[in-house]
A protein has these predicted regions:
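A short alpha-helix capping/helix-coil boundary motif
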Residues: 47-51, 73-75, 93-96, 125-127, ...
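Hydrophobic alpha-helical segments, especially transmembrane helices
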Residues: 7, 75, 96, 158-159
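Sec-dependent signal peptide cleavage junction
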Residues: 22-44
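Short, well-ordered surface patches within globular domains
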Residues: 58-122, 164, 168-170
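Sec-dependent N-terminal signal peptides of Gram-positive bacterial secreted proteins and lipoproteins
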Residues: 4-29
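A well-ordered secondary-structure block
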Residues: 3-6, 32, 115-187
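N-terminal low-complexity, Pro/Thr/Ser-rich intrinsically disordered segments
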Residues: 38-65, 71
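Short amphipathic alpha-helical segments at helix-loop
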Residues: 51-55, 80, 139
Length: 188
């Protein structure tokens, strides 16, 4: 096996970044932390996900990395990979933007609505659905890997990512330089 200097440098840089993320998250104060909000999921007796001509969004590189990490985790756990869904991504981006713009961090908006209300308003009905939220302050500690790690370490978020029956995912990330908010939404 031929090892190049570039590969060694990339490996060392990656290790240093991961150690920094881990040490910062372990020693983080409330002003410097990756926080996840208790996952929500719901099961309803309705038709499967129905998506026609609804608002759609495309994953950016960061969001794509989050989705890929979740899929790798699911498949390494013996579950099916889940497909990117443009309307769910639109909804996830709306959620992250609302959390950022209005400065709250909850599965409930200040008006008491949830992502499930947003799904219904955008024509998505499903039997199985869920949401994971995460935020990082300062924004620099909020890598896709850090969010996956935080969700894996939270029993409710981990169960939500590994829920049998999910077929679709949407991911939305907003970064204002000081704070990153990531929303993942899942449906069958």
């Amino acid at each position: 096996m031929k090892v190049s200097l570039k590969n060694i440098v990339v490996f060392i840089a990656t290790a240093v970044v991961m150690l920094l993320v881990i040490s910062m998250s372990l020693a983080a104060s409330p002003a410097s932390a990756i926080e996840v909000k208790g996952s929500t999921s719901s099961t309803q007796e309705q038709a499967g996900a129905q998506v026609d001509s609804k608002p759609q969004a495309v994953l950016n590189d960061y969001e794509n990395a989050v989705a890929a990490l979740i899929n790798n985790y699911r498949t390494s756990s013996g579950l099916n990979a889940i497909a990117y869904e443009p309307t769910l991504t639109y909804i996830a981006k709306l959620r992250s933007a609302d959390l950022m713009d209005r400065g709250y961090f909850s599965h409930y908006t200040p008006e008491g609505t949830t992502v499930f209300d947003l799904m219904k308003a955008n024509g998505i009905t499903s039997k199985i659905r869920g949401e994971n939220l995460g935020q990082a302050m300062p924004a620099g500690i909020g890598s896709p890997e850090a969010f996956l790690g935080a969700w894996r370490n939270s029993p409710s978020h981990n169960a939500n990512m590994l829920r049998v029956g999910y077929n679709y995912i949407g991911v939305g990330m907003v970064d204002n330089g000081d704070r990153i908010v990531v929303t993942t939404v899942f449906t069958n």
